Amino acid sequence: MRARLVTEENKKWWTLAAVAFGLFMIMLDNTVVNVALPSIQRELDMQLSELEWVVSGYALTFAALMLIGGKLADAYGRRLVFVVGIAIFTLASLACGLASSGEALIAARVAQGVGAAMMNPATLSIIAVTFPPRQRGTAIGIWAGTSALALALGPLIGGLLTEHASWNWIFFVNVPIGVLGIAASFLLIDESRDESHERLDLPGLATSGLGLFALTYGLIEGNNFGWGSVRIVGAFVVAAVSLTVFVLLERRQRAPMLDLTLFRNRTYVGANLAMLLVALAMFGVFFFVSLYMQNVLGYSAVEAGAAFLPMTVLIILIAPLAGRASDRWGSRWLITGGMVLLAVQLAYFSQLSDDATFWVLLPALVLGGFGMSMTMTPSSAAAMRAVPVEKAGIGSAVLNACRQVGGSTGIALMGAIMASRLTSPPTTASFMDGFELALVVASVIALAGAITAAALIRPHDRSHGAEPVQQAAEAA
């Protein structure tokens, strides 16, 4: 059967399908928990800051280990690292579903992040070595569309499973998917690696991981302990020192975890900053809009998930088209326009009342569908066109780390803003006060992303990085 379905001509598309299958699973877990949070909170008796850790623990570990995951993929084999990542993620998903306390759930979510950090950079680097430059934008468009689709479908799938089974099943469902993903990877993905065999940068891993953890900890726990407390000020000092030491170390390492020469290309810098800022603005929105729909508007878990469908459908339709448009015209104005749309969406959301109907929400959801598609797909395509094929693993790891750092920081930042306005006990009025301020801040962040993209990404970025990748593809 495989011989009839998979040929030399179409194998690269089957490879893309296998990669997208695994990618969908790990990206889904960024947002699938959002509509289940009220149920998790009730059953496990968790506070708001603990709920933030359920989401941020995954995103933070994902981000902190992403660069090392890219290095592992390039050095030891992209398929091997991808498959090992699926196995870790699958086992951690089982542990999440079996968790009987908030602490156990957070620990299992951290383990999920380890698996995801191995899988995600391998997906883009597999695409980079599989597709020639003329098709890479389309392939990355499908990749980015899959990622955005998973993020958008997460609330709906989470709502259906939470309401008709239990919150545990948002994690249990990953187990059969993971097993199928491992089988598909061995059948459909060819092994590839960078033969330079550079050693791992453990000091870089330690300092970057500590810095990101300290930053997120300070933002999430600031309201609990006081922003001027020794604990929180100390966390921010540790974050600043650790991240500064990380950059200094990377400049001196013979085989750095983060290849700083990548940032000599301003298009690559612009694409990564755009990805970081869109995640910073949007991940917190998914988190708190889900809470708003259920705790303020009275939506059920399924209704809250279904409310995101207009955005989901638009992402399905537009993300691949955005990839093709990026191939033809470059990414600069697509990203800029997408970020402007997201800024308008967030400003609109900030003006919602505590009795808004779905039809009032709809314009913002439509804007979000267009904005996410026009931003995430072209950002990914621009970044990967700007790196040579031998740097594909670390190049994609940096891009995805920016998204996850932005996501975990965004949730922490929006949570800190919300918590600063919540009364004890929380009231609808205090929730709406914090909700409005958080979304205004998110809108400003999205607008900053538009300005960044317009200033840094070259108008004809489609040509950058094509030659080295083309030569490598032809040599293969």
Outline where the language-model segments fall.
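Helix-loop-helix hairpins in multi-pass membrane proteins, especially solute transporters
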Residues: 71-204, 230-231, 305, 321, ...
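C-terminal module of multi-pass small-molecule transporters
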Residues: 77-86, 95, 100-103, 107, ...
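MFS transmembrane alpha-helix packing/gate-lining sites
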Residues: 29, 58-65, 115, 146-150, ...
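Flexible interhelical linker loops that connect adjacent transmembrane helices
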Residues: 5-6, 182-209, 251-266, 327, ...
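C-terminal membrane-cytosol helix-exit motif in multi-pass small-molecule transporters
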Residues: 136, 175-194, 209-221, 238-253, ...
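Transmembrane core module of solute transporters
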Residues: 12-61, 166, 203, 217, ...
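Interfacial helix-cap and linker-helix signal at transmembrane-aqueous boundaries
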Residues: 40-41, 72-73, 157-165, 219, ...
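Intrinsic disorder in cytosolic terminal tails and internal cytosolic loops
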Residues: 1-11, 194, 456-476
